[in-house]
Design a protein with these regions (language model features):
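Conserved micro-motifs of the catalytic ATP-binding
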Residues: 16-21, 61-64
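A conserved beta-strand-to-alpha-helix junction within the catalytic ATP-binding
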Residues: 22-37
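Short conserved segments within the C-terminal catalytic ATPase subdomain
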Residues: 42-52
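Short beta-strand/loop element within the Bergerat-fold HATPase_c
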Residues: 90-100
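Acidic ATP/Mg2+-coordinating residue in the GHKL
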Residues: 108
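Short conserved segment of the HATPase_c
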Residues: 113-127
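Conserved glycine-rich
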Residues: 154-155
Length: 175
């Protein structure tokens, strides 16, 4: 219940533009290396494999709020963990340079999302599989928070998925 209240409070603040973003130039390699190190320890303890590929050069920078970007990454990874149903879960993270943006791809080999549900996963309170929600927890607003943060950064977010194969979440952030 506390998590739901915290997420609703955060969403209300973001939605009414009451969260002051602290935008700064961030070195992509250094920032994501730190994130991967932190995430890797958690995934290792859960017996989930992690592969990380940074295809940007060492000097690539983005303009972002490091704390809010970390929230985005943790939320997406958290969802991947919740819906991994394979004996050996795997998460791949790829960072690519795409012109004026960097593109982040977070791929899992979980149960995937039905094509009918995919257009709605970023909507507030949307839950793709109600029968599994009570077991996995969550409020149904995590991805809508992620979308709002990415859009407030001048980026966009989308996903592709195949049932029983996995999901790839993509987002772009401006340089």
């Amino acid at each position: 219940m506390d998590t739901l209240i915290n997420e609703l409070t955060l969403y209300a603040k973001i939605d009414t533009n009451r969260i002051p973003y602290n935008f700064a130039k961030i070195n992509v390699g250094e920032y994501f290396n730190d994130c991967i190190e932190e995430i890797g320890l958690d995934l290792e303890s859960k017996n989930i494999g992690l592969a990380y590929f940074n295809y940007t050069d060492g000097s690539t920078q983005i303009i972002a709020d490091p704390e809010q970007l970390r929230r985005v990454i943790h939320n997406i990874i958290g969802n991947s963990i919740k819906y991994l149903d394979k004996q050996r879960g795997l998460i791949n993270i790829r960072i690519k340079d795409v012109g004026d943006f960097i593109q982040v791809e977070i791929e899992d080999n979980g149960r995937g999302i039905a094509a009918a549900d995919l257009p709605y996963i970023f909507d507030r309170f949307y839950r793709a599989d109600a029968s599994r929600n009570s077991a996995t927890g969550g409020s149904g607003i995590g991805l809508s928070i992620v979308k709002k943060i990415i859009e407030d950064h001048g980026g966009k977010i989308w996903a592709t998925s195949k049932e029983s194969i996995g999901t790839v979440m993509y987002f772009v952030i401006r340089k």
